[in-house]
Amino acid sequence: MRLLSLLTFSLFAVIGLAPAAQAKDKLTIYTYDSFVSEWGPGPKVKENFEKECDCEVNFVASADGVALLNRLKLEGSKTAADIVLGLDTNLTTEARASGFFAPSGIDQTNVKVPGNFKDDIFVPYDYGYFAVVYDSEKLPNPPKSLKELVEGDPAQKIVLQDPRTATPGLGMLLWMKSVYGDEAGAAWQKLQKRVLTVTPGWSEAYGLFTKGEAPMVLSYTTSPAYHMVVEKTNRYKALAYPEGNYLQIELAAQTTTGAKNPLAKKFLAFMTGPGFQDVIPETNWMFPAGKTSKPLPAAFDALPKPEKTLLIPPYEVAKNRRLWVNEWLAATSR
């Protein structure tokens, strides 16, 4: 029998009919580039979830959250995305109206974010506050308020992100609108004198900053924690402004395509627990939105705490985003 089995196997191998290993189920996640970088949360999240699901996770990266939504709109119902990870509350109304997202169907009891944001489609996975981050060795006297940033020395440059492609850029746009209202256009004209460049996403902007191209960058109050934990330096600092800092809550959702893949719902549930949440503080350098199994790194205790939280309702952002982007374009192109 052994000989017969061996001969049978050999025959199948020769004619290319040898039994193949069963292909694993796949989950495709669209996200932003820093999430999937070697130092981002992507690799560890992928490892943890694949152990749990015995599946294959494929990340597809775009520049940032706004670009993710733009891409999904272009692809429509033909998208390969099961999950889109990297939107934020500023995009939820527009994203819902697209019709490309499906209810999560998961228990969100473990999810806790400022303002108690809850949604049947969009699930929070982390949050943070936009802030000016500066190099204390190059800028010993940074702007102590948004007003000082807008009206300060044009020689002290800042790197910003494009609100048309990057959620931090959109966050800055809404921050300016929250503080300056109808005078935002005039404020942008003043601030433009300090802007070294505007990048498509966060990664490019922060890279220019750490390379010394500018002493300031738009980032998060939590960004200095990376330098404290990984580089063992307090050189880079964030600023909490008296006018308030704009809140960002990052979200993930399953697409209508993903709703047909059982792994999508399973991933969203996994995302609210320690297998995902424990990875966030020291890779995405944001506050976790779900259940963790350990406390935050001690460096987070040293971070500035915003005196006031700013957040424009999603429906108002959706109604006015194009108008406000055009206002920014008109002001900064003069």
Curated annotation (Swiss-Prot):
A GO CC term assigned to this protein in UniProt: outer membrane-bounded periplasmic space
Which is one GO molecular function term here?
Answer: thiamine pyrophosphate binding
Q: Which residues bind thiamine?
A: 64-65, 166-167, 202, 220-223
> What is a biological process (GO) this protein takes part in?
thiamine transport
Keyword Aminoacyl-tRNA synthetase assigned: no
Q: Where in the cell is it found?
A: Periplasm
Task: Give start-end of the signal peptide.
Answer: 1-23
Q: Which UniProt keywords apply?
A: Periplasm, Signal, Transport
Q: According to the lineage, what is the superkingdom?
A: Bacteria
**Protein's job:** Part of the ABC transporter complex ThiBPQ involved in thiamine import.
Q: Which NCBIfam families match?
A: sfuA, thiB
Quaternary structure and interacting proteins, as annotated: The complex is composed of two ATP-binding proteins (ThiQ), two transmembrane proteins (ThiP) and a solute-binding protein (ThiB).
Query: What family does the entry list?
Result: Belongs to the bacterial solute-binding protein 1 family.
Name this polypeptide is given: Thiamine-binding periplasmic protein
Q: Which organism is it from?
A: Brucella melitensis biotype 1 (strain ATCC 23456 / CCUG 17765 / NCTC 10094 / 16M)
State the organism's lineage.
Bacteria, Pseudomonadati, Pseudomonadota, Alphaproteobacteria, Hyphomicrobiales
Q: Gene name? A: thiB
